[in-house]
Amino acid sequence: MNNGGPTEMYYQQHMQSAGQPQQPQTVTSGPMSHYPPAQPPLLQPGQPYSHGAPSPYQYGYANGMASPSGGPVPSNLPSNQPVLPLPGVGGQGAMPAHYSFDTTGQHPPPGMKPRVTATLWEDEGSLCFQVEARGICVARREDNHMINGTKLLNVAGMTRGRRDGILKSEKVRHVVKIGPMHLKGVWIPYERALDFANKEKITELLYPLFVHNIGALLYHPTNQTRTSQVMAAAERRKQDQGQMRTPPAGLPSIQHQPHNSMALPGPQSSLPSNNMARPPLDRAATFPTPPTTASSVMPNMGSTDNFNWQGQSMNGNQGTNAIAIDANLGHARSMPTTPATTPPGSMQPYGSAQSFDGSRQQMYNAPSQQSPYPASNGAHDRMYGQGNSYAKNDMGPPSSRPSGSAPSGEHEHKGSNGILPSEHGHQSHAGEEDGEHEQHDAEYTHDSGAYDSNRPSYNYTAPGVGSLAGDANNVDPSMTGSPNHPPASGRATPRTAAQPQPYYHNSGYGASPRVQQAPGFYNGVGGDRPAVNGGSGSDVYAPPADMANPMPNGYAPAPQVPNGVSGVKRGREGDDDLSRPVGDVPGMDMKRRKTLESSMPAPPFDSMSGRTAPTIGGDPRQR
């Protein structure tokens, strides 16, 4: 390894000397001190960045002229000179070839002045050197010396397909798709870019690009002051970006100080405290973010006052307590606890007050939400004498529930007709059953007031059913099609008592032509039927005064009604009625409501003088 080191140094100096004898090498190494560390990339791509020689090269870029890095190199050269000729004898055979085309990139063509610009690539956090050739800007990074291969091959005039194929075959490449146009493309290592430039013979066009210490070209005497300012600004900005990125990682105070001491140890030693001092003060206005940086500085700095002030603004005592806890905890752990503890602490008093208020608002808002529905149906409500119930609903739960017992009887009675016709339509609304209705309705209203408010919306349909429900008790169960359901059981079987069906009987089927045909059928099949009913087939249009006679007569033909209905069906639905005995009607009622609806007009046929209304009352029972 001792021999390997001198040989590398020898090659570096030999390349810099441009073929000069070895003894003048020591002379040229002084003025060329910034070159020696830069040479290894050309000769041995893998080693130069791993060995000690290139590290001064990097420091040389950071500090400018690399005076400290150049110092140790000449000091090593005189001590190693006796060793240099030995490896040089064997190595000089191979070196001139590499060295020959390396000079093309290192030395300017005759009459050409270097034109290099530098820009700070904020996305990558690196300084880029740019060289323009044939109207194309080719950039080279300062940190890893990669070159934009896409722009490089564009300078060569290569087609897009060939260029992309070459760049895709590169093992080491960095694709950039976001950023300035001259920085987009595929970035390749310095050595590969130099090979491509030599093959395409564009190295001279890109002269300053491949100079190892390209940063030194920026320090031209006519341009030195400004370029030094630009480089210093770039370094400061790079450090600021590094410090702004690292704090969220966990322990910024531990990370920044070594970082600064490594990058620029001398003057930057005081920066860590300053850099950490600024972000918390600047960002203290927003509550969640300051703990990320200020938590590490919190015990040492006065920024805790800011946090205490914020905590007090939200909730005085709890905010200060949270900060005290943060000061005692570790810096990394105090960061999340600050926003986690103070906001809940500040929210607790409001939460406790609002939770109770919110519950009361919900209690009072429930009737208010119920009230819109009654309000929309207010006309119907007043028609049926339920205006008082809505006043009680608007009052609030405590007032409506206790007072709803006595007057709500009306409301609940109507509600049973309105929203619960399927439940109570089967039953007669006599005194005892009405009392039961009121009791059950009271249970519903106390349990769910929201449903109670919706009930009146259906009340406009109830009275017709309710007024006729008393007559439904006079109809035989077999006649209604639901013999298995007694009047009391209808409360638990709403499906068999669907509400919409009676409406169709009222409008469509109460006085339909089928009703007219029923007497004809009775006259044709059994002549005694009209006599039993107390009139002929034309009794369908008999005045209501005859209702007293047919009312008692309706009980006799009731069991025979389904057979008669089959005739009313005109034979089209006769098969259904023949296949459906009276005992099967309840089961069939679940599946064939329409057929039952059409079969229900049979009671009018028995009483046809004017008993269409009782059939309506009977229909809810069979439902």
Curated annotation (Swiss-Prot):
Localisation: Nucleus
Ranges of compositional bias, category Low complexity: 396-408, 542-553
GO CC annotation: nucleus
The species this protein was found in: Hapsidospora chrysogenum (strain ATCC 11550 / CBS 779.69 / DSM 880 / IAM 14645 / JCM 23072 / IMI 49137) (Acremonium chrysogenum)
Domain HTH APSES-type: 115-221
Protein name (record): Cell pattern formation-associated protein stuA
Region annotation Nuclear localization domain: where it falls in the sequence: 569-594
Pfam families: KilA-N (PF04383)
InterPro entries reported in the protein's UniProt record: EFG1/Phd1/StuA (IPR029790), HTH_APSES_sf (IPR036887), KilA/APSES_HTH (IPR018004), Tscrpt_reg_HTH_APSES-type (IPR003163)
Region (Disordered) location: 13-111, 232-270, 332-623
